[in-house]
Amino acid sequence: MRTSLIPGRQVRVQLLGLLVLVAAPLAAADEPQLIAPVAQQVIQRQGFDPRVAPLNDPEGDSRGWADVALIWTSPANATAGWQSRTVLLENAYGTAVDWTELTVSAADGKLHSSLRIPAGGWYRLELRHQAGTQTTKSLSVEPVGVGEVFLISGQSYAGGYNDEKLKVTEPERRVTAFHWREDRWIVCDDPVPHVGPEGTVWPALGDLLVPMLRTPVGFVNVSVGATSTSSWATDGPLFADMVTAGKKTGSFRAVLWQQGESDVIEGTSATEYDARLKVIRCTAMKTWGLDVPWLPAKSTLHPTVYHKPKEEEAIRSAIEELWSTPGFRPGPDTDALDGENRGGPMTMRHFSGIGQRRAALLWFVSIWTDLHRPAADDTKDK
């Protein structure tokens, strides 16, 4: 076979190619990388005072804020000279933060800092390194928001076992879900990862909340179909998953608990249900290091599966009792949704599409009412 390559030159060319292949990942490794926050992430705000109308406090901080953790890598691991800011994206709520000098620490090969960001979004978060007046490195992520985050737990009515796959209709898509097994945030379109193949109520709830709260909304859903309170025992795998998801989220406004049908089937007494849920909440709160309310829904009807008025009433009375128990607050009574709100035998046999939207409305009323509860009521949770 004829070749036009001189042997010595061929070796040099091969070595040059090898060096290029090796150098490419090395060059990429030399580039700074932003680890947190991530795109679509919603960080729970603090300092929100709904009793102060924003129009009466235009320059105040009654809408709240978050000290957003910044984590990134940079080859030199230099801690001096870093700045960060936020930029309002189109139609965003909130207030932009101008370039701010960061106090940076280094640990485990990463750089760590934080930036106080007012409630709102979407934002683009930017990070840069300055040497005098020269920008030597720059990073950014979008969209990110500071708003309201809710952890969802329970069984199939909370998960993806309802008739219609709902999509977020909020124009800027400011309703997201934490894919906690993969540590990423996504738009909260059904089906949501891990919780069933079909529809939920949560996209519709987010659509209702965002324009009223004027912040993005995030959901973390750990519900599992066909589970009773005994399935969520604190020494079991479902509780462990819930704890993991909560730890990864960091902070959230409340736990939305939609569950009860399997306890109706098992014949759980009101006393047992009450005691179990108190233990589940108490243990979770201690593990998370948080003290947030749980809003249990009255969720006992399952018309295509059973008709057990006595057992249903036992669970309803337990939830009624929990609503007045410190650490718990009233969720919705979704048992009010019967008839056309439930799918028939040839469907998913949970909420129909209209039922999903009405359940979302009931959840909205509960959350909105809770956010605006009198300040004096907060002492009742202690």
Regions from the language model: what does each represent?
Residues 14-24:
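Bacterial N-terminal signal peptides
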Residues 11, 27-28:
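Exposed, low-complexity/repetitive linear segments and helix-based recognition motifs
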Residues 30-382:
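Cell-envelope and extracellular/periplasmic
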Residues 1-11:
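N-terminal secretory signal peptides that target proteins for export/translocation
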